Amino acid sequence: VRQVVGLRNPGHSVVKLMNPCAGPAVVVTAYTHPEYLDMLHATFTSMGMTALLSRGLEGEVATDPRRTPRYDAFLAGQHRLLEEQQPGTAAEVPGLPTEIDVATTAEYTRQVLAGALPVPPALARQVEHILQLAAQIS
């Protein structure tokens, strides 16, 4: 499907909606194409889901450490805009490597988790949003 219409197949979108938890949970998901915002908004609302939805890079849920995306929260299906997308890309993120290979990315991640490098502000903000939503369902 991607080669023909330029989008992933519908299965990719369905997987992003899955909640593997038996109890209350925050579904964290993202979209790339603007038309998916309306579809996901309607889905989360009609299903009464609790979710954090962001405008992702290639639809990936982990935010780009150089950008602050739009964040929409859904608490039991009720929508709230948390944050508008901030314009531009950070010129520099302390410690963020320019290489994007697996080994470099893994080493960078290890250093951030160990506290040797700072958590990028954009990622810290995403975690804050997740924790705030999770606190409302526990």
Language-model-detected regions and their locations in the chain:
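Glycine-rich anion-binding loops and their surrounding alpha/beta cores
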Residues: 1-138
